[in-house]
């Protein structure tokens, strides 16, 4: 089993359950006066995280009704659709979202929440399934991606 790199952070108590996923969206205005805000905000904005362990510490929080809890999180894999010419397992990609219409039935899969455009990801799996129709190019393929871990430069064609 692969060991995931974890970070200690603080989340609202309703999210403090192993397996809960969330997308970190950045600081709220109410955080400016908080003495422990740096622990809450040690994540990368726009990325998807999964709670992997709960710690005993709980805190009052002006943002989260019911307080906040210290947890360990890891970056969560995200399923998305990509061009078939780059859909290969263990390939590093720089995400560039296609320019298409939000009314497209696969728009959300091609522009998933929790993936940051312009950042590097590794395709960990090419998933089987029906081809998705696309009006602007070849039918995109469903893959699972994880952010490229820090400190691991990879060749990207």
Swiss-Prot record:
A Pfam family: UPF0179
Transmembrane annotation, as ranges: none
Family as reported in the entry's similarity comment: Belongs to the UPF0179 family.
Entry-linked HAMAP family: UPF0179
Name of the molecule in the record: UPF0179 protein Mhun_1135
Organism, as annotated: Methanospirillum hungatei JF-1 (strain ATCC 27890 / DSM 864 / NBRC 100397 / JF-1)
Lineage of source species: Archaea, Methanobacteriati, Methanobacteriota, Stenosarchaea group, Methanomicrobia
